[in-house]
Amino acid sequence: MILLGSTGSIGQNALSLARDFRLPVEVLVAGHNLSLLNAQIAEFQPKIIVIADSSRASELSLPKDSKLLFGEEGIIESLHLAQSSFVLNALVGFLGLRPTLESLRLGKTLALANKESLVAGGSFVDASKIIPVDSEHFSLWFLKSDKPFSRLFITASGGAFRDTPLEEIPLQKAQAALRHPNWSMGRKITVDSATMVNKLFEILEARWLFNTKSVDALIERNSLVHALIGYPDGSFSAHIAQADMRLPLAYAMLGKLDQPLGPPLELERLAALSFEPINPSRYPLWNLKEKLLTHPWLGITLNAANEVAVEKFLEGKILFGEIPRYIERSLERFSMIPASIEELFALDSEVRQFAHKL
């Protein structure tokens, strides 16, 4: 396995499965958590390791005959050097797009947890060759058959501020936004869950993966129903499972799963099941949903502006309520359709420069 993003929550879950099912790991790619990476290296003995910063190379304890690479170019080189045919892209942010494109170009099997690859680069990615790892898209894939459908639904937990009084939400700081009610995730995706940007991303991902604009989302507070498919006859199918990222990862890594990964879901827990609409008064960015489905190339601008805003928010430079302004102003300024992957990367850079000045 080639694991891009080994020290994040997805990467750690993937390595838990690799341990349980004795799967070899050839490549580990990580950012700055080198203490955890060292523990992973000691256990899995990868042949190739990639880290973000070459100046920290001395902090690593490397296996004999292993190769150490650095940065984005190192990630791409590792894809070429590795013999493994399976790639799990669990990188965070726009950084994940180029490795996605290169993995597919090299004919490798790609399990995708990097949302931004499709959000920003969906026009240039062959989504039919991707194994989805997001719990929602895995659930749609699990449910989907040749039977015609009328609508796809994914679910949201509502994030950290789902019950916060509306007037208090704009004043919130990072510490409060990082208290997700259901999932243990990375910092950026937890903030994206609170703004509902994460669900906008997933709506766009579903559009590319399943080739439909008929995608919507609902709040299901327990994170037990991950997706639903509506049929022309008015009936629905739902995928119900524990909130455990190892389930979609297991199908991606193993191809199938014929044993439980944990205790079975107690059906009594479904007694309190309910679905709520996503209220734009609480999640103002949700107003962008139809615009993004109609003009999916705007995902490039959405993603770039959001990354800048979330970084500033996590650094304490802006309050939670200022995040939408960065995105809305950027979308007002940039609406062009990139004609090539080079234009896409140029647009991403231009949006970031604009957003940094806001």
Swiss-Prot record:
It is an enzyme of class 1 (oxidoreductase). InterPro entries: DXP_reductoisomerase, DXP_reductoisomerase_C, DXP_reductoisomerase_N, DXPR_C, DXPR_C_sf, NAD(P)-bd_dom_sf. This is 1-deoxy-D-xylulose 5-phosphate reductoisomerase. It holds the Pfam family DXP_reductoisom. Pathway: Isoprenoid biosynthesis; isopentenyl diphosphate biosynthesis via DXP pathway; isopentenyl diphosphate from 1-deoxy-D-xylulose 5-phosphate: step 1/6. 1-deoxy-D-xylulose 5-phosphate binds at K115, S135, E136, S157, H180, S193, N198, K199, E202. Its EC number is 1.1.1.267. The keyword Cytoplasm does not apply. It comes from the Bacteria. Mn(2+) binds at D134, E136, E202. GO terms for biological process: isopentenyl diphosphate biosynthetic process, methylerythritol 4-phosphate pathway involved in terpenoid biosynthetic process. PANTHER family: 1-DEOXY-D-XYLULOSE 5-PHOSPHATE REDUCTOISOMERASE, 1-DEOXY-D-XYLULOSE 5-PHOSPHATE REDUCTOISOMERASE, CHLOROPLASTIC. Keywords: Isoprene biosynthesis, Manganese, Metal-binding, NADP, Oxidoreductase. One of its GO terms (molecular function) is 1-deoxy-D-xylulose-5-phosphate reductoisomerase activity. It comes from Wolinella succinogenes (strain ATCC 29543 / DSM 1740 / CCUG 13145 / JCM 31913 / LMG 7466 / NCTC 11488 / FDC 602W) (Vibrio succinogenes). NADPH binds at T7, G8, S9, I10, G31, N33, N114, E116, G186.
